[in-house]
């Protein structure tokens, strides 16, 4: 058997391997997908991602965040609206990864059935799971979101979004 010359290629398997599906995202990768920046980028990393379906993100809550200066000085609590925004940003990762929607800007179109079940304080790690329920005309959709701390439900609700040009 002769060795292949520099112009010959060794035989390869005709079947190609599908591209690897990314299931986690670092902070740097999130910044390439979402337009938010400090102090309004509220997702530190994505620890689990199922394309077109759901994402699980982490927010490490620290006393250094600017909202704790006034909410509240003697008893810092993460504002509920920021918990909802953090869940929406995790949902944004799901949306920006949908085929033909890469680079789209998604904004709130509505919020339903949001309930806060537990306080979120500095030192907590917020684990947010956001699942895409439906999308219509590739412009409007709804997601179910949950935020937990130490396995305890902190907030939940339905988030509606719209794609703007």
From Swiss-Prot:
<dbReference type="GO" id="GO:0019171">
    <property type="term" value="F:(3R)-hydroxyacyl-[acyl-carrier-protein] dehydratase activity"/>
</dbReference>
<dbReference type="GO" id="GO:0016020">
    <property type="term" value="C:membrane"/>
</dbReference>
<keyword id="KW-0444">Lipid biosynthesis</keyword>
<dbReference type="GO" id="GO:0009245">
    <property type="term" value="P:lipid A biosynthetic process"/>
</dbReference>
<feature type="active site">
    <location>
        <position position="71"/>
    </location>
</feature>
<keyword id="KW-0963">Cytoplasm</keyword>
<feature type="compositionally biased region" description="Polar residues">
    <location>
        <begin position="1"/>
        <end position="16"/>
    </location>
</feature>
<feature type="region of interest" description="Disordered">
    <location>
        <begin position="1"/>
        <end position="20"/>
    </location>
</feature>
<dbReference type="Pfam" id="PF07977">
    <property type="entry name" value="FabA"/>
</dbReference>
<comment type="similarity">
    <text>Belongs to the thioester dehydratase family. FabZ subfamily.</text>
</comment>
<dbReference type="GO" id="GO:0006633">
    <property type="term" value="P:fatty acid biosynthetic process"/>
</dbReference>
<dbReference type="InterPro" id="IPR010084">
    <property type="entry name" value="FabZ"/>
</dbReference>
<dbReference type="GO" id="GO:0005737">
    <property type="term" value="C:cytoplasm"/>
</dbReference>
<keyword id="KW-0441">Lipid A biosynthesis</keyword>
<dbReference type="InterPro" id="IPR013114">
    <property type="entry name" value="FabA_FabZ"/>
</dbReference>
<keyword id="KW-0456">Lyase</keyword>
<keyword id="KW-0443">Lipid metabolism</keyword>
<protein>
    <recommendedName>
        <fullName>3-hydroxyacyl-[acyl-carrier-protein] dehydratase FabZ</fullName>
        <ecNumber>4.2.1.59</ecNumber>
    </recommendedName>
</protein>
<comment type="function">
    <text>Involved in unsaturated fatty acids biosynthesis. Catalyzes the dehydration of short chain beta-hydroxyacyl-ACPs and long chain saturated and unsaturated beta-hydroxyacyl-ACPs.</text>
</comment>
<dbReference type="InterPro" id="IPR029069">
    <property type="entry name" value="HotDog_dom_sf"/>
</dbReference>
